[in-house]
Each structure stands twice: as structure tokens, then as C-alpha cells.
Amino acid sequence: MTDRTYPDDRAGSFPSPPATFTDGEDREIRVHESGPEESDALVEMYEAFDPADRAQGIPAVDTEAIREWVDTILSGDSVSVVATHDGRVGHAILVPDRAEGYELAIFILAEYQGAGIGTELLARLLGQGQEAGVEHVWLTVERWNDAAIALYRKVGFETSNSESFELEMSIRI
């Protein structure tokens, strides 16, 4: 058990994948469920990340470390969705922790940020999580990452711990 807290009320229902939408840059984006079969494509996407855009040390920089990380997070009971437009441009995942919750991670390639892809990808991930029986989701985000914090609050995350240099946020789905 952990002393992590979650909101008392559920955030509501979220749409599940698949979905196709037009982003803020007029690009057609497809969101679909992903799993281990996406490993090679996701490694390729994560290799394209600028080291300066990495948060909390992930994704790794070295290809083998990226592959090991991707294989680890895609195994077991994780819930994962991917956004595509001429290849993989975003990935969001819920990874079960040792307690009752799932940790959320979301990554969007820099040239696709700020166009609404993160919002759609996050909503579809939470919808897929609801279908899989996930109830508690948490994440950590760097305090200076205002765009990410605004996105998480927009879909219903609440700050559950603000005692360190990172914020911990949680949602009940």
C-alpha cells in the first residue's frame, strides 16, 4: 500500500481508441491502441527525441536503452496508445505500479506539440484504461512544465503531492 492519494470522485468517461482527428496544424492524426507489436516503431520515434526535450531522464538517449525501456513498459498489464501521422508522433502509456495505481507517461515529438495531439492522446488513453478496468492513475511532472500541467488539469487530474521539485498529480477514472 502507498500513501498516494486519489480524488474521491471519478473524472467521468473518456473516449477510447481508435480515432482519427485533424490537429491544430491541419494534419490528420490517428490514435490507436498499441502493444508489443509497436516496439520497433516506438523505438524509432523515441530515437527522434531531442535530448533537451526529455523529461525526468526518459526516454533514454541510447538506442539499446530505448529498446529495453520500451520493451519493459509494453509488457504485462500496461495500457498503451499511439498517435500516428507519417509514422509514430506520440505515445501514452499506463504502467501498473506496485500498489493499486497506474503511472502515466506521455510523449509527443516536438514538431507535433501544441496542436491538440496530447489532449486527444491522453483522453483516448484514459478511455482505454477505463475499458481495461483501471481506476487510479498518477503521474509526476516537472513544476516548470506549464503546458503539461494545464493538459493534465484539463482532463481532470488534481495535484496530490507538491512537496518536491516535481508535482504528483492523480485522477480516478
Where are the predicted features?
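Conserved GNAT acetyl-CoA-binding A-motif
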Residues: 129-142
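Conserved acetyl-CoA pyrophosphate-binding loop and the N-cap/start of the following alpha-helix
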Residues: 112, 116-124
